[in-house]
């Protein structure tokens, strides 16, 4: 940490005594250590000070230049600003020879040219706030009113560093000796001289105050601590550090200065300043030698002085090891008393005490589930989640009730399954940030209101083994400490976005891909499977690797024994877009379904379909993540929620494959945690086993039932009802243009002017129009429907790729597909 500290001279520029004969000159503020000796004459005057033609302005500029050079050459940081003009009508020094200097980095919220000393009332209020609120600086600043949060934080830092308890000194009197750092000087005159030397000396080593590097938004307040320490030196012996020199003698130099033999003059000033920053280091021998070297230039008896100081240096070197050993036992800033196992009191640093306070007492899992009155907010809740009860406009008690009750409702729905934070967020939009929702969720879990009896519930975080355990604290308000531990209790998990753009746990999406086999690969694989049947031993279970993920599984039908969990109604607009999208590609296409779910009526309405881009590898295809996110946002802008997905089986049955079942089951589980529903729809436009020109559509969900061989969960098919609302014609035209532009140049595009099967006279385009006509027959006037179909036909004829442009290769592949 020492490398991060900087010595800031807060007195050197104004604290020097005036040169003889130049009391009024501004040059008198500079001491020998600021200028090289070659620039001085024998009488101590600077050459440029003798020139009376230099104006005051130029003289001030020269002084500033020399001061800057000294700071740069000595590797010191320049002050924020320093006054060089001595005109009383313009500027005045903020520090004088009779007052110790003060430095303050002001907060932007409270600008001031100088720092304001803390009053007795402010200090008393600070201590009251500290006892009441602890280390919550915002609360204490609100109590003070006259101080900002940063100023309170800065004062607290100095307050804790200079706080030394009397009872600690009383209990350890036998540990004090003449070699300790905390010793008292026997001579009152010597101590008074040391305090005066602290103020009057211009030695930068004496006037250096070590300041820890802080962030840009923190105040550094060193205004009144130094004054208090020097003024209370003779009264509060526990508030400063001095070095005891038992046989110290006083001597007078030829210039009449009162000095002390030994390192007291040096160590006294440093000790008083080191108390300010909480340091207990003894002055080194190099610092004493440096001080003697500077006295040599002004003292005629330098030989005698050096001889005496060399003796002191030797003695100091001999005892330095002992002093450092004693320094290890010196009390640290803000000592906290603690008793060890033997009953002896021990001192621990404040950072350790603070960490142990945060660990707190281990919470016990609730013994029984807690029932909470939905209309009442208990006092414990206000203590644990105080942010909703502090008068904020965005966080009100009503909003807290809404969030809490919604979480409790979701727990009742999913009980006994674990209710995580992610699953409750979709139903709490515009109710605050995810962190405050998470804190309420964790609080309810800790008290046993939700997730009671679930293995995933975490009530205590693991404690490091090498931590020093604090003694058990029996506090009446221990129950209210939950609020400080809400977010730190549970181990953080990696968060990722699901295909719909929502944040979720990474484990929720493991193994989920939208992959489907092309028609050619499906036929080839089936032939291979017939030629090479797989033989399993009777005792062995079906290996997972032997399962064909593209095997189609017929759907079961709901019955009286197993009724539909809800009804499914599909709007004409969604049917039109799904048919348009599925008819133009020999490869599978994918999209999202948007709509709404009515919990009261148990009805799921599919109001819109949003086509998405798909990525194909020849054997399988999956939805483009970017396109999925855009589609989800588009549905949200229209006021719809994502309630399902659709894809096509171009030339085979609209039954789900094993991979479709796995994907649908995972998304059902994910959306059901938040109370939402999620369905899957499969469109088969060119199924060879279907003699009719209409597409086959399957709407399904995956049940909890498992197949007889235990390899997959059983899919169930809904009886879909069509809604009687007219589609938004312009929106359908817009989607049609996008589909045509997307697939007209695609290698997998279907030639719409070709006969779609041998025993039919309809082209693919005419077949598409027949499907659309059947959909519109229930919702629109026949004239409006025919006009719409005519415009769709014109769009394909004018913009879609023709058979000749496709090439012979694609024509052959099309024949193989449809014939």
Curated annotation (Swiss-Prot):
GO terms for cellular component: cytoplasm; nucleolus; nucleoplasm; nucleus; protein-containing complex. Its main location: nucleus. Residues 568-700 form the MPN domain. The modification Phosphoserine is found at residues 107, 215, 332. GO terms for molecular function: DNA binding; histone binding; histone H2A deubiquitinase activity; metal ion binding; metal-dependent deubiquitinase activity; transcription coactivator activity. Its EC number is 3.4.19.-. Keywords: Activator, Chromatin regulator, Cytoplasm, DNA-binding, Hydrolase, Immunity, Isopeptide bond, Metal-binding, Metalloprotease, Nucleus, Phosphoprotein, Protease, Transcription, Transcription regulation, Ubl conjugation, Ubl conjugation pathway, Zinc. It comes from the Eukaryota. SUPFAM superfamilies: Homeodomain-like (SSF46689), JAB1/MPN domain (SSF102712). Residues 1-29, 228-247, 260-279, 318-347 are annotated as: Disordered. There is a cross-link at residue 184 (Glycyl lysine isopeptide (Lys-Gly) (interchain with G-Cter in SUMO2)). A motif (JAMM motif) lies at residues 647-660. Component of a large chromatin remodeling complex, at least composed of MYSM1, PCAF, RBM10 and KIF11/TRIP5. Binds histones. This is Deubiquitinase MYSM1. The gene is Mysm1.
């Amino acid at each position: 940490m020492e490398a991060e500290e900087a010595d800031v001279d807060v007195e050197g520029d104004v604290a020097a005594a005036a040169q003889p004969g130049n009391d009024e000159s501004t040059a008198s503020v500079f001491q020998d250590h600021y200028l090289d000796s070659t620039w001085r004459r024998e009488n101590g005057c600077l050459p440029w000070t003798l020139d009376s033609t230099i104006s005051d302005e130029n003289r001030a500029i020269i002084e500033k230049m020399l001061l800057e050079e000294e700071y740069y050459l000595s590797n010191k940081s320049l002050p924020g600003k320093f006054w060089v003009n001595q005109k009383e009508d313009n500027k005045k020094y903020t520090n004088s020879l009779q007052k110790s200097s003060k430095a303050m980095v002001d907060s932007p919220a409270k600008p001031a040219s100088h720092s304001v000393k803390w009053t007795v009332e402010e200090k008393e209020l600070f201590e009251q706030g500290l006892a009441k609120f602890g280390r919550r600086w915002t609360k204490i600043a609100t109590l003070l009113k006259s101080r900002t949060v940063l100023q309170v934080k800065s004062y607290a830092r100095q307050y804790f560093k200079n706080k030394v308890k009397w009872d600690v000194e009383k209990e350890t009197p036998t540990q004090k000796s003449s070699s300790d750092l905390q010793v008292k000087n026997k001579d009152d005159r010597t101590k008074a001289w040391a305090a005066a030397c602290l103020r009057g000396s211009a030695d930068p080593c004496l006037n250096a105050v070590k300041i820890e590097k802080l962030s840009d938004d923190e105040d550094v307040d060193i205004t009144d601590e130094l004054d208090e320490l020097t003024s209370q030196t003779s009264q509060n012996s526990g508030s400063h550090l001095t070095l005891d020199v038992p046989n110290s003698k006083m001597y007078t130099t030829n210039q009449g200065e009162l000095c002390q033999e030994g390192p007291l003059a040096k160590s006294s000033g440093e000790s008083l300043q080191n108390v300010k920053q909480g340091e207990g280091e003894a002055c080194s021998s190099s610092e004493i030698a440096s001080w003697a070297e500077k006295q040599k230039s002004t003292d005629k008896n330098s030989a005698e002085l050096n001889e005496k100081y060399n003796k002191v240096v030797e003695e100091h070197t001999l005892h330095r090891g002992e002093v450092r050993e004693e320094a290890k036992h010196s009390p640290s800033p803000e000592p906290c008393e603690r008793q060890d196992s033997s009953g002896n009191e021990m001192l621990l640093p404040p950072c350790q005490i603070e960490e142990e306070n945060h660990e707190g007492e281990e919470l016990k899992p609730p013994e029984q589930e807690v029932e909470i009155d939905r209309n009442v907010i208990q006092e414990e809740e206000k203590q644990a989640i105080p942010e909703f009860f502090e008068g904020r406009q965005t966080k009100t008690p009503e909003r807290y009730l809404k969030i809490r009750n919604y979480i409790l409702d979701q727990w009742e729905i999913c009980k006994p399954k674990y209710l995580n934070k992610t699953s409750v967020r979709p139903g709490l939009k515009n109710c605050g940030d995810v962190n405050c929702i998470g804190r309420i969720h964790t609080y309810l879990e800790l008290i046993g209101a939700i997730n009671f009896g679930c293995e995933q519930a975490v009530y205590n975080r693991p404690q490091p083994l090498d931590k020093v355990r604090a003694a058990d604290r029996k506090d009446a308000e221990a129950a209210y400490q939950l609020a400080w531990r809400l977010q730190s209790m549970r181990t953080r998990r990696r968060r990722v976005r699901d295909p719909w753009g929502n944040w979720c746990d990474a484990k929720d999406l493991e193994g989920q891909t939208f992959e489907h086999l092309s028609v050619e690969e499906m036929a080839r694989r089936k032939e291979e499977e017939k030629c090479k049947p797989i033989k399993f031993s009777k005792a062995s279970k079906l290996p997972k690797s032997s399962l064909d993920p593209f095997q189609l599984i017929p759907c079961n039908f709901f019955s009286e024994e197993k009724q539909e969990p809800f009804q499914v109604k599909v709007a004409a607009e969604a049917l039109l877009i799904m048919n348009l999208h599925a008819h133009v590609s020999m490869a599978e296409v994918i999209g999202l379904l948007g709509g709404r779910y009515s919990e009261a009526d148990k009805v799921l309405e599919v109001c819109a379909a949003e086509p998405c881009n798909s990525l194909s590898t020849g054997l399988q295809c999956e939805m483009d993540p970017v396109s999925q996110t855009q589609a989800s946002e588009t549905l949200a802008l229209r006021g719809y929620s994502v309630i399902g997905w659709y894809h096509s089986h171009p030339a085979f049955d609209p039954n789900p494959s094993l991979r479709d079942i796995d994907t649908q089951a995972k998304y059902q589980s994910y959306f059901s945690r938040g109370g939402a529903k999620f369905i899957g729809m499969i469109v088969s436009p060119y199924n060879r086993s279907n003699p009719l020109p209409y597409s086959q559509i399957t709407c399904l969900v995956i049940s909890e039932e498992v197949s007889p061989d235990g390899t997959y969960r059983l899919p169930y098919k809904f009886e879909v009802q069509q809604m009687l609302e007219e589609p938004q014609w312009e929106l359908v035209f817009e989607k049609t243009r996008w589909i045509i532009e997307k697939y007209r140049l695609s290698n997998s595009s279907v030639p719409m002017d070709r006969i779609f099967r041998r025993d039919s006279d309809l082209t693919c385009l005419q077949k598409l129009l027949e499907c659309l006509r059947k959909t519109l027959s229930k919702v629109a006037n026949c004239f409006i429907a025919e006009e719409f179909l005519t415009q769709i036909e014109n769009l394909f004829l004018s913009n879609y790729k023709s058979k000749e442009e496709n090439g012979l290769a694609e024509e052959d592949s099309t024949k193989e597909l449809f014939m």
